[in-house]
Amino acid sequence: MHNIHRRHFLKAAGAVTAGLITANITASTHANSVAPKPQTGKSVIGLIAPKMDVVRVGFIGVGERGFSHVEQFCHLEGVELKAICDTHQAVIDRAVAHIAKQNRPQPTVYTGDDLSYRDLLSRDDIDIVIISTPWEWHAPMAIETMESGKHAFVEVPLALTVEECWQIVDTAERTQKNCMMMENVNYGREELMVLNMVRQGVFGELLHGEAAYIHELRWQMKEIDHKTGSWRTYWHTKRNGNLYPTHGLGPVSQYMNINRGDRFDYLTSMSSPALGRALYAKREFPADHERNQLKYINGDINTSLIKTVKGRTIMVQHDTTTPRPYSRHNLIQGTNGVFAGFPNRIAVEHGGFGKSYHEWDMDMQKWYDKYDHPLWQRIGKEAEINGGHGGMDFVMLWRMIYCLRNGEALDQDVYDAASWSVVNILSEQSVNNRSNSVTFPDFTRGAWEHAKPLGIVGA
């Protein structure tokens, strides 16, 4: 194992990084420009990278989420873990030890400061980079990854401003490199089964969807020096909107063929009072603790409504503060029936195994028997063994590598990443303007009208 500190191979990118992390975030409430920007490259809809016999992987960030990816990649065939980068020695040591335990060659380690990742990007023996860092680093790291000739795979959300979204789209088109936001929920067994059912017309013509990220995470406020809560807590003091829209919205978007025959048109959003985090801090921390000095402005519950160009509606909710069970809603309503998640249930007028649509059908097994997605039929057992949010993480990474090794287009592209992530910014703009509607940028520049829907991908 080699420990290599910065060589600053991308000196010119320093100004870009600084601008993205500071100026763009503070400008997030500025008026949204909806006119498509002049295209400087070629559309990457359906982009197919040259086949790779072996996919050589670099990891930026191997903390909580990043280490999970390292674990999953160790179970995949046709990959080499070439390098890892992090600023915390403890998580580096953990990742290195795990890779050794799996009898894989030791990766080169990059550390030293926040820009050490550039040394990893300077290598010419890495094909893809997995980015699992605090949110404000996602956009600059993705851009620099593509500029260095590598494909970028980024944790959610992709970006934090409209301008960042455009910069990432433009870079992908100019470099002809993939930039996939790793929305793992799209690979859940239920979500892929519903996608299969939608494609087979079980629910009829689609009308409405409901998506959410309802996940009580106040406990993360106790992560002070390291881990997710050490930085994520502060976003509740900076922005009032839907901070984390993609887990629920990603699957619903694929059901509705967003960016592939339909697209988001406009959004309206409103937030409840921001009370829960201050109350939690008062209860769990000393009066003079920093957590009690913060002003929490993000509403405990944010609700946004999206209208698509075809007239469909989507409700999107965010709540990581109130005490209630986890949910992503995952509801899709069509002219013949509905699927709703948490708990899973179905009601259809025709083709419902004889059950009336006036009552929920909670017995999922017969639906799985008929509509289970081919990916889960093939690797479901392996996914359940290897874990990762019930197996969805493994299926996502397996599918990514399969596409790269077999010359297939990825299931999610940069336009999906930008469209799903930009809800973060647009919801804030709407909330701050008495819930007036905000228009979505068309990141595809009109190409959505002719793009083919995502099929029932196999393997």
From Swiss-Prot:
Name-wise, this protein is Glycosyl hydrolase family 109 protein
Cofactor names from the entry are: NAD(+)
- Give the lineage: Bacteria, Pseudomonadati, Pseudomonadota, Gammaproteobacteria, Alteromonadales
A GO MF annotation of the entry reads: hydrolase activity, acting on glycosyl bonds
What is the UniProt remark on how the cofactor binds and its stoichiometry?
A: Binds 1 NAD(+) per subunit. The NAD(+) cannot dissociate.
Described function? Glycosidase.
Q: Which family does it belong to?
A: Belongs to the Gfo/Idh/MocA family. Glycosyl hydrolase 109 subfamily.
The record's keywords, sorted A to Z, are:
Glycosidase, Hydrolase, NAD, Signal
Q: Which InterPro entries match?
A: Gfo/Idh/MocA-like_OxRdtase_N, Gfo/Idh/MocA_oxidrdct_glycsds, Glyco_hydro_109_C, NAD(P)-bd_dom_sf, TAT_signal, TAT_signal_bac_arc
Binding-site residues, NAD(+):
E64, R65, D86, W135, E136, W137, H138, E155, V156, N184, Y244
Task: Check the UniProt entry and state the signal peptide residues, or none.
Answer: 1-31
Please name the Pfam families in this protein's record: GFO_IDH_MocA (PF01408), Glyco_hydro_109_C (PF21252), TAT_signal (PF10518)
- The entry marks the following residues as binding substrate, namely Y213, R232, Y244, P245, T246, H247, Y326
Cell inner membrane is among the record's keywords: no
UniProt-listed PANTHER family: BCDNA.GH03377, GLYCOSYL HYDROLASE FAMILY 109 PROTEIN
Q: How is it modified after translation?
A: Predicted to be exported by the Tat system. The position of the signal peptide cleavage has not been experimentally proven.
Q: What is its EC number?
A: 3.2.1.-
